[in-house]
Amino acid sequence: MHKSKRNPSFSSTLLDEIYNSIDPKTQKTQPYVGSVNTTTKKQSIVTRSVPDRKIHRDRFFGSVSSSSDSNSSIFSSSDTELTHGKKTTSSRPLCFGPSKTKPRKTEDKTLFHQNRATRVYDDYDYASDVPKFNRHDENWENTRNRRSVKSSGNQKKPKTPASPGGRIVNFLNSLFSNNSKQSNAVKSYPRKTSYDDSAYVRKTSNDYHSSTTTCSSASSFSRSCMNKGYEKSSGRIKRSVRFSPVNVIVPESFTSKEEDYFSNGNARKSVKKNVEDGGRRSVEEIAREFLRDYHKNHENSLVKTNGFEDYEDDDEDDDDDDVASDSSSDLFELDLVGNHHHHNVYGDELPVYETTFAGLIL
């Protein structure tokens, strides 16, 4: 019994190793036989623990020594005992025969993937390693190339100095453009007449409200005028219209005495009378009253000069005919008749009639 404990058999050691490999948690102490000295025997007895299956399997399968000694046949020839302080390292016993344990699948898989990766890496075609661009990338490259070409072209072009002639031309163009803008606003100026009674009123461009200004000027033919300004928006043309509504029909037999009658201010009375009445009288009434006064004075002058009563009767008949034939349409013939005798006075202007109501005209 003592001999079996000192020198265990091969089968017992093999069973112990298999049991320890299956269940590594169980720790079992086993004495080891060292050299002849007793000190080395005590140091060689160590408690052996099984740490991990992998380490145990790697240490279990190793080279086997060939020794004829029965005492050292269980241990390998490469067994070493290193005593360094209290730590003692010794090689584990190696078994004869192949291992029946199954290899791990994880190790095989890792080796397979490593070999495959190396094969793929060696067979990789480096010529195909070209970056592929989609349409967006190509467009971006084209725009970048165009910008670079433009920038290089701008750098190559020398900057031309500003010539004084070009500055003068730009200055003149700016002046003409300002003049064209100012010419859009049309201003109305009154025309000069030979008589002193004319009073024209002109509205400036600063007036923002449309207004009507009336002025009456009585000359030998009792002409009245009216300025009427229409104010439009700021960007449009401003216009002014002058109206001459009231005129008198003068017969062809116009003498110097009759001209004196108009120059004395008799024709102006009818106009003033209409203004005092509030402008309610019509143009026809004013014209008829004016013609009656004119014919009466004309008859009196003919009686004094000639002394024929029959001529007065004829003039009365003519007076009735003139009053009967008088109408608003006859007033428009004044300028045609007056231009024969007084071309200097009325030749510069043409009348414009807006209404037949004297209250609005005068």
UniProtKB/Swiss-Prot annotation:
The keyword Signal does not apply. Keywords: Auxin signaling pathway, Cell membrane, Membrane, Transport. Residues 50-60, 132-144 have a biased composition (Basic and acidic residues). InterPro entries: BG1-like. Residues 22-113, 132-168, 303-327 are annotated as: Disordered. The keyword Transport applies. Residues 63-78 have a biased composition (Low complexity). Residues 309-324 have a biased composition (Acidic residues). It is found in: Cell membrane. Residues 23-47 have a biased composition (Polar residues). One of its GO terms (cellular component) is plasma membrane. It comes from the Eukaryota. GO terms for biological process: auxin transport; auxin-activated signaling pathway; circadian rhythm; positive regulation of auxin mediated signaling pathway. PANTHER family: PROTEIN BIG GRAIN 1-LIKE A-RELATED (PTHR33541), PROTEIN BIG GRAIN 1-LIKE D (PTHR33541:SF15). Belongs to the BIG GRAIN 1 (BG1) plant protein family. Involved in auxin transport. Regulator of the auxin signaling pathway. This is Protein BIG GRAIN 1-like D. It comes from Arabidopsis thaliana (Mouse-ear cress).
